[in-house]
């Protein structure tokens, strides 16, 4: 049922905490509604843990959308991600897996303002995504706080879908950053071996 012929897969990672899911799901559902007004050949695959599947399902069932699926099996998740034409992910280590499979993506994140303000005071980084932090620039688009809304998400995702060059450029850039990270990890392992 998931791998319907003539349908392109978009993988969606709405978070691993209930609080994140409750903030991001309404945004994601409204984004899918906007997409469905124009595009009719996408299936949205929500990657979830077994414990959060029901919560995500409740959001999907609350609206008239029939092109969403939820998966919680890790093997199926990897297979689905590999076959995806795009990924939308809450910031976190999952972005490394997305890049490893050469899937173009966007990072979204929203938290309550007090927590965000405290986090910004404690962590002085320009980006939240590990690829962007390593690159020192925005390789993967990030929609944070107020920018994390259905309209901006639709605008960026559709701009990628409509432009194969943009997709190719992002994949090339992420692969370059991944290779740099691998080299740095290998070098630090060699150094620690030499010093031990």
Model-derived regions: residue spans:
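Nucleotide-activated sugar donor-binding and catalytic core shared by glycosyltransferases
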Residues: 1-196
